[in-house]
Regions:
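TRNA-recognition modules of translation machinery and tRNA-sensing kinases, especially anticodon-binding
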Residues: 1-198
Length: 198
């Protein structure tokens, strides 16, 4: 269903700020593929999602750079560590409105872990760090919340999810923590909502 939605702008300066923040938290830049194999897509796709995928030369446009990291790991091209990358994210949204889009831009975080427990601990720490970053970007702390989910944590600004964090195994069986470093235009939408209201 498509509603009359106001198209929001992407503020690239927020990515510059987020990059500095996550760099200070130990994350390093990684060049990643924007198209991956179907198993990398399937690995992170929720069971209840019907996925209409964009295909080019037998590869699929990513829904998040998490899949890009999985592809690199599968190919033996991802060293253990803490990585960040920005990709367009293609989604098959059931409802398109002011906060739901078929395409948006997202910085994804990926940190290697030693076990499931370690990966879950790391994802929780990343989610808490994200709340601090969102506050520095201009979202009042009082409207931000950390919500436990079946697979990890979501960060909400009021009733809008602005970050998702969790733990999984790669296709090769290694534990890792993942999360949203920054997503646009949702972060801009949240900032604009409260600008001048503090």
């Amino acid at each position: 269903m498509v509603s009359e939605a106001k198209m929001s702008n992407i503020d690239f300066t927020l990515f510059i700020d987020a990059h500095s923040w996550w760099k200070c938290k130990g994350f390093n830049d990684k060049v990643v593929p924007s198209y991956v194999d179907d198993d990398a897509m399937d690995h992170t796709c929720p069971e209840d999602v019907t996925d209409l995928r964009i295909v080019q030369n037998g590869k699929y446009a990513v829904a998040s750079a998490e899949q890009s990291f999985l592809q690199l790991d599968k190919e033996g091209k991802l060293e253990d560590g803490s990585w960040m990358a920005v990709t367009p994210c293609f989604r098959d949204e059931m409802v398109l409105d002011d906060i739901h889009f078929n395409i948006f831009l997202k910085m994804e975080l990926f940190r290697s872990a030693t076990s499931k427990k370690n990966a879950e601990k790391i994802s929780h720490e990343i989610a808490k760090d994200a709340i601090s970053m969102f506050t520095l970007l201009g979202i009042p702390r009082g409207v931000l919340s950390l919500v436990k989910t079946p697979i990890g944590y979501d960060v909400y600004c009021d009733d809008m999810e602005i970050g998702s964090y969790g733990a999984r195994k790669t296709l090769t069986g290694k534990w890792y923590a993942y999360g949203t470093g920054l997503a646009e235009p949702r972060t801009s939408i949240a900032i604009q909502k409260y600008r001048g209201n503090e």
